[in-house]
Amino acid sequence: MYGIAWMLPALILKCHGQTLIWPGYECVLQGLLALLIAQIEILANPLFIAASCLLLTPNKKIGAAFAITALIVATQTFTLFKVDIYLDEGGVNIAHLNSFGPGFYLWYSAIVLVAVAACVRLWRKSRSI
């Protein structure tokens, strides 16, 4: 799910009446620059990868913490509806988020799935003690 999300349209933007469609990989590249304007949702990716790896180890608490943190950070993506997205350095071309594409929903679902799996594993472990 996560890998496929990188190839599918993730963000659908409007700029001067034109529709721009950013696939997931472009969102990742642009997300690195978004850190400069306090848009931290790009950090959900390394947190997600760390959580996925930690769920395969006995560190269930740390894996759950990473997964929940990834989910919280990824949720900041919804604030993009209220943020100007600058497409050039001069501020001439400013886009606004129109809607999310299937890539976004797959990306977000993968993070939700890992967070739920981490919490279920942690809950099962606590009940077996």
Model-derived regions: residue spans:
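Compact integral membrane and secretory-pathway proteins
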Residues: 1-129
